[in-house]
């Protein structure tokens, strides 16, 4: 059977595709040590960031590049919650093209009634929702512990939600594109390492982009990585005023479209090129 020819979806089974949303949460619940490990990593990073920013502001004064200590800590806590939980989650998942190609089960992605691209999209939606639960839980704890400040206004909170949703789409598309390179490489380890480094540095997940030189910030700020963390967190902290948010949201939406088109092209070529390491 050609990988491009898929069986028709039975009418009574089509609505069941939405059940893939629960695939990731149920898998994580089945392996509870992963939840503990993710929580430990996030708590440790937040603790170290709080110590770091308090020490820096004790030496430098009230503000650094226009950010006060409360904004800096809030930025780092939210960036950690948005980035670390998602990365740890993706790293623990075995539903990747690389792992499936190694054991040969990737062929089932292309012979199921549900298209492989839609299967990954539903699963990615579940990953985003699960990561959002970590974000909301950590945000609640951070506010109660006075580590995270509330957004400056309700409009700022609303535009942050929109920006966060767009950022999650970009996050998924970047991860998908990196994973799809497995169809053209013997191993995607190097690509994954490079993408993880770029995501951590260029998204503002490690250090706020506002602290970098102007030339670096102006370049990184227009890359898709910044759309995942820097933009929504900057809107939340008030670093980007609500009145100036339209161009940032438009750029996020543009990256969503461009990455989706590129992903669609890669899916089409991947269906015609399949290398199974197991023979």
Model-predicted segments: where are they?
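Hydrophobic transmembrane alpha-helices and immediately adjacent juxtamembrane helices
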Residues: 1-279
